[in-house]
Amino acid sequence: MIEIEVFPHRFLKATTTEKFLNSAYSLETVQRVIMHGESLPQKVNYGPAKGTPVNHSERKLINVQGVEVQLTLQVGRFWILLDDETELSKIDEICKELFQYGYKVSEGRFIKDSPTVTDYMKYGESFVNNIDKRMLGVTDPRSRFENSVSLIPKSEKGE
């Protein structure tokens, strides 16, 4: 397994994020994509305008491989888990096509692969010991799982 980070030099619009995710998930070796960026809350969480709705133009529903995903952040980077390095050049081609303003692709270790103390505190020992290891590190411990994770099924060959 290889992990790469794709770091565009600008925050992405929802349409660009959708194009990138659909292109990335169309590759055979891509197992998981994690997005990072600035939060796009539904309402102001603090200050004098607390509770006021935030009508951000980029908080949209996007379609990734047929699954509707509510975009709750303005994406600034992607962590991608690949089976092997055979399609690294294809990811670079996708980036060149979509990110004309520049980007950086790094190979390294970005996704945690073992449970932390926070996982045990949040979910409990029995849950952590039985969870699919691919789900580790996917969600913020302060958030609700269903609000922060969207599962995109990988289509099999021949479909």
From Swiss-Prot:
The keyword Oxidoreductase does not apply. Signal peptide: none annotated. It comes from the Archaea. It holds the Pfam family MCR_D. Transmembrane segments: none annotated. GO terms for biological process: methanogenesis. MCR is composed of three subunits: alpha, beta, and gamma. The function of proteins C and D is not known. Disulfide bonds: none annotated. Keywords: Methanogenesis. InterPro entries: Me_CoM_Rdtase_D. This is Methyl-coenzyme M reductase operon protein D.
